[in-house]
UniProtKB/Swiss-Prot annotation:
Keyword Glycoprotein: no
The protein's name in its UniProt record: FACT complex subunit POB3
SUPFAM superfamilies: PH domain-like (SSF50729)
Spans annotated as Disordered: 482-569
Quaternary structure (record): Forms a stable heterodimer with SPT16. The SPT16-POB3 dimer weakly associates with multiple molecules of NHP6 to form the FACT complex.
Protein function: Component of the FACT complex, a general chromatin factor that acts to reorganize nucleosomes. The FACT complex is involved in multiple processes that require DNA as a template such as mRNA elongation, DNA replication and DNA repair. During transcription elongation the FACT complex acts as a histone chaperone that both destabilizes and restores nucleosomal structure.
Any one of the GO BP annotations: DNA replication
Pfam families tied to this protein: PH1_SSRP1-like, POB3_N, Rttp106-like_middle, SSrecog
Family: Belongs to the SSRP1 family.
Basic and acidic residues: bias regions: 491-500
Compartments where located: Nucleus; Chromosome
Length: 569
């Protein structure tokens, strides 16, 4: 046996690029073919080794002693097993154990927690292994369901690069990769049964029965070092209302990350993931909103949340002492944090995030204010109502869907009337067109009283503004003026023809002056029609007709004759 055993085309921790692997008595090393950092491991740090079939041939999985991490070397040939078994036995005093995977394709089996990974076994054969370093987060998705989120390729459990550095997640996996896995775990169990051989020595707690899914979740948090084990808590804020994602969460703030702990979901977020931080006063003058832009965003199943929106009462005070000594405050944070705070809650949370995350806090621009002397404009995106804020360098709509649009990415801003709406005269829409064909965003139902202030602010920021409302008003006014001119001309023409029209008369052959009206018969209670009543009434009518005839004969002398006296008696 030579002093060095070399193997080509070996992949370290699912790396995209192969490299050369060399084993020696002092340990082994791996170097990528294209050049880069070399990974080495001392022989004293090798706890165990396993040989099994893998994606690119056969792999050796090595468990480290110190960090309890997993190292995968993939790409060996089947005939390499004898050489490697001798290397591990003679140089590292370790047995290279050969294991076969379960290939039945069953999705039910037994989950076992070992020192470095979670193993899912089917009929006592491993179907797959999940190293704890690959787990980014876990949540109770239901009463009997646990969701496990994988660490992103850029960062591992401790936000450190993986691959040849092997301190976090596996090196740059392919474009399509597993991001979440869910386990359905019904029934109850004990901690000893859940953890198996690695269970603790506390016999009292081991024998206590508990919901199996909850126990699985708690064990995974402990094994993968998710949550409190990431370090000492610097500050904690309880029961903070979140508008996005909706719910109430406890905020635990650590040195490099913070954690949102809710009843159903928990999130662990690195401060490096915070790209934007804003403090926005709500137009109700009672609340403040704290908005954090995250990259990568939070995941809740298939839903992504690129922004976290918290809400605090304006007058809610808090007194808190940070879990840091004076030396740490001066050396690590350079007086960006204070040991004691006694201020409104939203200000304290914002200042601690600024100090720990080293992020600048943005606020609404001072050059814009609404007609109600507020910074937020009430509007909506489609059916979702919210508030639009004009910052110094961007638009920000909150709470849902939280939308951030930088002014430098804006091609034009268009004011338009609400088409076909009853409130068209009192509200308008804003359409923001993005550069390079990136689409557009529309903010609807904005009060008409804020139109001039918005137009002036956008022009101040150098944005291209198109006001279709004024253009429509001008066109409408011109059309109405034209219509009025046309109607005046028509009236004048009719006036010129009026005298000639009035001179023309025609005889209405159907008109009869001596005919009685049917209306009187229908509505006059004293009217009596022909052919009705007794004979006396007919006689009286005849006498009345005779009197009428006499009156007609004497009509010419009526003015000269004195009136006849009525007979009495």
């Amino acid at each position: 046996m030579t002093a060095i055993e070399s193997f080509d085309n070996i992949y370290l921790d699912l790396s995209k690029e192969s490299g050369k692997c060399r084993f020696a008595e002092t340990g082994f090393g791996w170097k990528p073919v294209g050049g880069g950092d070399t990974f080495t491991l001392d022989h004293n740090n090798i706890a165990s080794a396993q040989w099994s079939r893998a994606a690119k041939g056969y792999e050796i999985k090595i468990v480290q002693r110190s960090k309890s991490g997993i190292i995968q070397l993939d790409g060996f040939q089947q005939e390499d097993y004898d050489r490697l078994a001798k290397v591990f036995k003679n140089w590292y005093s370790t047995v290279l154990e050969s294991k076969e995977h379960a290939l039945r394709g069953w999705n039910w089996g037994k989950a076992e927690f070992s020192k470095s990974e979670l193993t899912f076994s089917v009929q006592n054969r491993p179907a797959f292994e999940l190293p704890y370093s690959e787990i980014g987060n876990t949540n109770l998705a239901g009463r009997n369901e646990v969701a496990v989120e994988m660490a992103l390729p850029e960062s591992g459990a401790n936000a450190q690069l993986g691959g040849a550095r092997s301190k976090g997640s596996k090196a740059a996996a392919g474009r399509d990769q597993l991001v979440e896995m869910r386990f359905y775990i019904p029934g109850v169990t004990t901690r000893k049964e859940a953890e198996g051989e690695d269970a603790g020595s506390d016999a009292g707690n081991d024998e206590q029965e508990k919901n199996a899914a909850t126990l699985f979740y708690e064990t995974l948090i402990d094994k993968a070092e998710i949550g409190e084990t990431a370090g000492d808590t610097i500050a904690t804020f309880l029961d903070v209302l979140h508008l996005t994602p909706r719910g109430r969460f406890d905020i635990d703030m650590y040195e490099a990350s913070f954690r949102l702990r809710g009843k159903t979901y928990d999130y662990k977020i690195q401060y490096e993931a915070i790209k934007k931080f804003m403090v926005l006063p709500k137009p109700d003058e009672v609340h403040y909103m704290l908005v954090m832009g995250l990259d990568p965003p939070l995941r809740q199943g298939q839903t992504r949340y690129p922004f976290v929106v918290m809400q605090f009462k304006k007058d809610e005070e808090v007194t808190i002492d940070l879990n840091l000594n004076e030396e740490e405050l001066k050396s690590k944070y350079q007086d960006k944090l204070e040991p004691h705070y006694e201020e409104p809650l939203h200000q304290v949370v914002a200042k601690i995030f600024r100090g720990l995350g080293n992020r600048k806090i943005s606020s609404p621009a001072k050059d814009f204010i609404t007609h109600r002397n507020q910074y937020g404009i009430k509007c909506s995106i489609k059916a979702s109502e919210g508030f639009l804020y004009c910052l110094e360098k961007a638009f920000m709509f909150v709470p849902k869907p939280a939308t951030y649009i930088a002014y430098e990415q804006t091609q034009s801003v268009t004011f338009s009337r609400v088409s076909g709406a009853v409130s068209a005269l009192s509200t308008f829409d804003i359409t923001v067109l993005l550069k390079n064909g990136a689409g557009s965003s529309q903010f609807s139902n904005i009060s008409r009283e804020d139109l001039k202030a918005l137009e002036s602010f956008f022009k101040l920021k150098g944005l291209r503004v198109k006001n279709e409302i004024d253009e429509d008003a001008n066109l409408l006014a011109a059309a109405m003026n034209q219509q009025m001119d046309d109607s005046e001309d028509e009236v004048a023409a009719k006036a010129d023809r009026g005298s000639a029209d009035e001179d023309e008369e025609s005889v209405d052959e159907d008109f009869r002056t001596d005919s009685e009206s049917d209306v009187a018969e229908e509505y006059d209670s004293a009217h009596e029609s022909d052919g009705s009543g007794s004979d006396e009434s007919n006689v009286d009518d005849d006498e009345q007709d005779d009197d009428d005839d006499d009156d007609d004969d004497d009509g010419e002398d009526e003015d000269e004759r004195p009136k006849k006296k009525k007979k009495t008696g």
